[in-house]
């Protein structure tokens, strides 16, 4: 008993002792000040990092992804704990910065090679997405060996990915998408064996994807869209068994779709659109049981509908548009019970309208336009309410009326039935009144009776967009116009090519109208003044009518952004009220009869105006200075402008197109324009430019036309070295395949001498390149560096004084379609290498001093004989072939040109002159003696003193 008491007492004493120590320690903790987590060297690194960039405008991409921009770094200061700063996360125990999230922080700056971010050694997450960072990724990233997530997407980073990226072996997520990276993907990326996410879309990568990418066995997302990858798709990707998303759209892949993709059994999303794939969809796709989205649009795929897809019952989106598929659509496509969107437009599908598609209850979007479907439009028995919201079946071979059963598609929001042969029956617009959700209706180019705009608009109470282009539309103005508020809410109205003669007065009450196209009609008179008072009107296309002027509005609304008035009969000065349209982005008044000078009041537009086209008018005077600083495109060709190019043009940093052709500009070559980093088209044709052009650095230039001026001198040997956009260096710069210069509502155009004739480029492809130096006084040799321009399509050096040989380096111009070196002083042989240019369809070597064998090859056999005339020393079977219809010389005769024929005629003339020379000289001497002896007044007056005066007068001028 006593022992138990001793043990209990000991336990109590020990317990009390521990309790006392705990209380004392806890008191010390309460009494001690709060410990700061942030380590000093970490704070110092972050503050230095903050000073490497500036706070600018929010990135517009943030709204696109639903993230609100916030200036996170404004909370960073010396007097606060860096672990509490916005975007900064620290390790709770060590105080080391482990995460840095600066996405959507409105930041602007460059990535420095000695960036202080390299001192954040324990950083695991770095997110600088959706800002305005630029420059190259530097080696400072290599120090961040603990990184597991790196996101630099949606910036302006450029250059190549360093091979050392493979050293970041802990990375699980790497997103570099939507930047300006270029070059090839380094094979070292295959060392990132823990990657689950790899995003490289929207850059300028080219070449082939390294096979080492097949080592990324944990990868679930691979985004490579919007680059210039080409060649064979690596079969090693077929081993990425965990891949769920594969994005390969907008590249330059060709050949057949690799069957190895069928091995990716976990694939959910597969995007292969906008490439050059051909053949059929592989049967191995039948293994993709998890696939929900498939997009193979804009390729060259063919064959019948791919039945292999019918087993993939999880498919919700299928896009086969813009291919070469044929045959009929199978009725058992209804087995795809989860199908929500089916796009098969612009193929060659045949048969009748596949009304069985309406059986699929989930179907929401259906696009079948641009096929060869025929028969009457029959929608079948639509018994249950349809979920269909989008239906486009235009541009087929359907005949007959629009069926009344369409009114049962009560959820329809967009409907396109253009190019329907209604057999001249009137359209019953009342059937559309049942479609309460209808927002967009396209009924262009119907073979129907006249549509009365005044009668049909009341049927559309909620319609936002209506396209009646290509129909015969009556817009007769009623005697009285109601002043009641409009019941319609149309925002976009397309009436192009409708035969309208008077401006539709009914539009006066359409206060919601924002987009109006009345181009290609016969509207006469003046543009009504009330049009400028519509509060929401931002786009107005008046082009190709017979307007003669503008009624001046009392007070124009400032909303107008696009004003297109080309090809009318406008006269007088450019209206001053246009200067009040301060939101104007595009102004096209080309092909009219405007006169006077360019209004100086246009200075009011300089902050927004991006595209100005005043070509083909009668404008005179000089160029105003400093009024178009934001311009992307300036075209004032075919006017009567004088003086020099304004030097203020060198400050137009956004300028891509400058066209001043056919004016009276007298100036030297504008070398100073080389400071414009975005300049792509330069046209100085048919002016009075003069002097040498020497070395001109235009790395972005795609088209240059300086023809028919007075330029002289020789071109340096290395003249074209820096013209990288026309060389192979510039081949892969753009992320998209086919694009045009211009904006969404306006495309640039120009006239260019191509293949011996003037050709109008209604739209300018961004991949189109041309050099025209013709009609000047250039001399010396053609620079060998011309051979660097491997992307060149048109080369015209004619009508100059070039000497020497045609450089064999022209044989490197594998994209060349047109070559003209005529009317020079070139000698030697035509280079055999030119015969290897498979795309060359036009060439002109005439009127030089060329000799030797004309190269063989199909390109030479398709030329005209006149392309070789004026070169006495040319011979060969190719020449005999192209000139056989002109004459057939004997085998021992030299090739005779029109020039030699003229020389023969001259010889005959001299022989005839010699025959008459003897009697003529005797008669002349006798007649002269009589005149000199008697000096008659009638002879001396007209041929003596007056003649001397005439000579002096002529010399003075």
Swiss-Prot record:
Glycans are attached at residues 78, 101, 114, 143, 167, 191, 215, 242, 263, 311, 332, 381, 477, 541, 544, 569, 593, 608, 618, 712, 796, 812, 836, 844. The chain crosses the membrane at residues 911-931. LRR repeats lie at residues 120-143, 144-167, 168-192, 194-216, 217-240, 241-264, 266-287, 288-312, 313-336, 338-360, 361-384, 386-409, 412-434, 435-459, 460-483, 487-510, 511-534, 535-557, 558-580, 581-605, 606-630, 632-652, 653-675, 677-698, 699-722, 765-789, 790-813, 815-837, 839-862. GO terms for cellular component: plasma membrane. SMART domains: LRR_SD22 (SM00365), LRR_TYP (SM00369). Pfam families: LRR_1, LRR_14, LRR_8, LRRNT_2. Residues 1-31 form the signal peptide. Keywords: Cell membrane, Glycoprotein, Leucine-rich repeat, Membrane, Receptor, Repeat, Signal, Transmembrane, Transmembrane helix. It is found in: Cell membrane. Its main location: membrane. Coiled coil: none annotated. Residues 932-957 are cytoplasmic. It is a single-pass type I membrane protein. Residues 32-910 are extracellular. Belongs to the RLP family. This is Receptor-like protein 34. It comes from Arabidopsis thaliana (Mouse-ear cress). The lineage of its organism: Eukaryota, Viridiplantae, Streptophyta, Embryophyta, Tracheophyta. The gene is RLP34.
